[in-house]
Swiss-Prot record:
The N-terminal region contains the highly conserved SGGXDS motif, predicted to be a P-loop motif involved in ATP binding. GO terms for biological process: tRNA wobble base cytosine methylation. One of its GO terms (molecular function) is tRNA(Ile)-lysidine synthase activity. It is found in: Cytoplasm. ATP binds at residues 30-35. One of its GO terms (cellular component) is mitochondrion. The keyword Ribonucleoprotein does not apply. The lineage of its organism: Eukaryota, Fungi, Dikarya, Ascomycota, Taphrinomycotina. It catalyses: cytidine(34) in tRNA(Ile2) + L-lysine + ATP = lysidine(34) in tRNA(Ile2) + AMP + diphosphate + H(+). CDD domains: TilS_N. Ligates lysine onto the cytidine present at position 34 of the AUA codon-specific tRNA(Ile) that contains the anticodon CAU, in an ATP-dependent manner. Cytidine is converted to lysidine, thus changing the amino acid specificity of the tRNA from methionine to isoleucine. InterPro entries: Rossmann-like_a/b/a_fold (IPR014729), TilS/TtcA_N (IPR011063), tRNA_Ile_lys_synt (IPR012094), tRNA_Ile_lys_synt_N (IPR012795). It comes from Schizosaccharomyces pombe (strain 972 / ATCC 24843) (Fission yeast). This is Probable tRNA(Ile)-lysidine synthase. Its EC number is 6.3.4.19.
Amino acid sequence: MDTIKLKEFYNSLVSIRRRVGHRRLGIAVSGGVDSMLLSWFMKESQIMFGWPNQFIAFVVDHRIRKNSTEEALQTIWNLNRMLIPNVYLNINWGNDDVHSLTNLETIAREHRYQVLTRACITHNIRHICTAHHANDQAETIFMRLLRRKPGTWGGLCAMKPVSQIPESDSICGASNIELLRPLLPYYKNQILNTAKQHGIAWEEDPTNADINLTPRNAIRRFLNQHAALTVEATKLATAFQSLQVNIDNKVDEILKDNIVSYHQPSGTLSLCFSKNELKKHSNLTKEELLLRCLTLTTSCRQIKRSSVVSLCNSVFDGKKLTIAKCLLTSSSIKDDTKLQLQISRQPFSKAELKKKTITINPDRYVLWDHRFWIKYSCKNTQTTLILRPLLSKDLNSLKGFLSKEEFLKFCIQVPGHIRFTIPVLSEENDKLVGIPTFGFNFRSDIISNCLHKFKL
């Protein structure tokens, strides 16, 4: 009988241990055999090897099926029996008719990760483990093969052992949380055999066997009947992940040698490349380089790799372009041997200006333009302010608030259109109160704060 030994599992945690150190770990527990075995392994690793020294299991009640709460409470009982600390969480669907949603699987996934993210923030947890395994990886590969566009490959990396927690970029603090998958090297039959060997109790979700419910269920049934394909799919994911690591390392080297400046208050990136050096790099490397640079400036939730692929050569050929709401301006310098590239936020359209003007309350972070988390504190807690882009009419007011030297420095740091893509706080009569990304506060009773969503 093929099982997973405790030492084997612990060895797969070694690289994770280096990342996590002595911080508390979280575990996402559905109650199924995968997450219950993961919880058991964590407890046994703590007893036998002294790590993790602290962990907590988060039991998520999805509230989609009538008996889901009963199953969640049974899972908590099973965890308590193993002396595993746990917290009950549930998804609040509000007035939504869950079963009328055509994309229920996707929405449920989003809600689940958001609930887990908030729990991690509440419990000061930076790393949470899920029980994804090799069969899940194979299913993901087949899902992406069915959906991907010809000529793209990024999605074929599938699930990585370590990644940022997904579906939670609208939650302040989510970017600090990593998702760990220590069971990814192991197959479902190994997990089942190991759980049975150690007498671990779990709950079965009957909907997982309904091939008419979701595409993933149908793919799971197909792969169960063709075990060899599961192995080949996981090998494919491993190969693409190795390719991604090699490209990432090259991009790291290029950025280290070629970044001129990254102005965080405006999210503007300036680089300078040797044209001869650029020619030596593959298209894949240049595409990943551009994608990495764009993520530091974009206001898009996701950047389509296809848009980067189609325009990559034009960018490095010195053309002015817009990609993913970023303006890319390049020029040749030093006898045409070098290429200088600046990436900044694309100027707002009239429609965007309206959307980017919002009323906010004190002491609560608000994500603005998907780039900056803005918050302000005020002695009068009833005070509401307007969060909006800087406008040309604000410059005269700004001259009155800043010294001549400060105003000149500000204009140099954010020249031209760039200055009109940064956020300001104002009263309802448009009187400036502050510029949070620069740390400017123009009212003594108000202090603004900014967290930058993207960091170099």
